[in-house]
Amino acid sequence: MSTTHETPEATAEGDKPCIAVVFGGRSSEHSISLITARSVLRAIDRDRWDVVSVGISTDGAWFLCSQEELEALLDDQPMAQLPVGVHRVSLPLQTGDSRLLIHDTSEHGAPLSRGRHIDAVFPLLHGPFGEDGTLQGMLELADLPYVGCGVAASAIGMDKHFMKLAFQAAGLEVGPYTVVHDRTWRTDPLGVREAVAELGFPVFVKPARAGSSFGITRVDEPSQLDAAIATAREHDLKLVVEAGIDGREIECAVLGGHGTDEARASLPGEIEVHGHALYDFEAKYVESDGATLSCPARLPEHVIDTLRRDAVRAFHAVDGEGLSRCDFFVTADERVLINEINTMPGFTPISMYPRMWAASGIDYSALIDELITLALERPVGLR
């Protein structure tokens, strides 16, 4: 698969487009974002792009954080949180002013030291306040191109309830589920228990708007339900309860198309989890042997074709741009059910999204180039 595209015209400040790699953030996935950013900063082509790296603390402060500082932090503490740096940054949020304003907040620093022209932003934040449309809306206000989905797609892709509605509207098959709103649980818990029982056990109780499998519990019998709901509510007061599906877990990666070209789907991969009841946080990010990926998945060719087609359909169902990862179940009778879409999938060395593209002919560095190029080609604003 060819991925060669011309580098956009360089800016006046340098001979290469300047990309702001942004990471950290206020969500529970802060540490995962740092691991993702370290991988991208190691692999990005410095001959093609100028790079400025920007951290966001858990309380929302933006500041310069060099690759060396990030590497040292993660070497010392693999699941670290960013300390606030002295060189704070901000965006002017003004059309035509594509600068990253850099403030020196050290004891004797000037109130404003300089501005840095930015051509595009590569947001590597996971979860709320990062991949849910909030950051994307701010970048739209700042008139800055950025990698990945826009405001609406990001918001839909963060909410397991609304993404399922979008899938169903597009004619994609989803498994049985029910939604538990905060008010409903507080005023009618018996009704919630009855609705869940109608799904049949086992079920999976999930926060509607959390990622990386935070707060997810498998429930095998009614007596376990209330505790699972309490666990999920620590992450989100809106929950989705899904019926357990007897099927294989298959993923497919999607890349947006250039211009009027169709979006592209990778070869699908199959996740095999080791030593865990489900594909949880530890299996995804901590244990290198927590899960294995077979890519391409060992499936009949017509099922692979269906998965790739449905991944692109799901991408368009949420108005996707740039990238996404779609998660499916394939049953013994070859039914394909879509479970979720992730508009900012994991991007670490053991993450499924880059591994599926590597198996499909696009290596990690080339994938980063492709995503940045797609961002620079795309206008901001209504499109």
From Swiss-Prot:
Residues that coordinate or bind Mg(2+) 1: 327, 340
Q: Where in the cell is it found?
A: Cytoplasm
What's the catalysed reaction?
2 D-alanine + ATP = D-alanyl-D-alanine + ADP + phosphate + H(+)
One GO term describing the cellular component: cytosol
Pathway(s) of this molecule: Cell wall biogenesis; peptidoglycan biosynthesis
Cofactor: binding details: Binds 2 magnesium or manganese ions per subunit.
The source's domain of life comes to Bacteria
Record-annotated ATP-grasp domain positions = 164-373
Keyword set, alphabetical order: ATP-binding, Cell shape, Cell wall biogenesis/degradation, Cytoplasm, Ligase, Magnesium, Manganese, Metal-binding, Nucleotide-binding, Peptidoglycan synthesis
The record's section on InterPro entries has:
ATP-grasp (IPR011761), ATP_grasp_subdomain_1 (IPR013815), D-Ala_lig_Van_CS (IPR000291), D_ala_D_ala (IPR005905), Dala_Dala_lig_C (IPR011095), Dala_Dala_lig_N (IPR011127), PreATP-grasp_dom_sf (IPR016185)
Name the EC number(s). Answer: 6.3.2.4
GO BP terms: namely: cell wall organization; peptidoglycan biosynthetic process; regulation of cell shape
Oxidoreductase among the record's keywords? no
Residues that coordinate or bind ATP: 196-251
- Extract one GO molecular function annotation from the record: metal ion binding
Asked if Transferase is a keyword of the record, the answer is no
What cofactor does this one take? Mg(2+); Mn(2+)
The family assignment reads:
Belongs to the D-alanine--D-alanine ligase family.
Q: What is this protein called?
A: D-alanine--D-alanine ligase
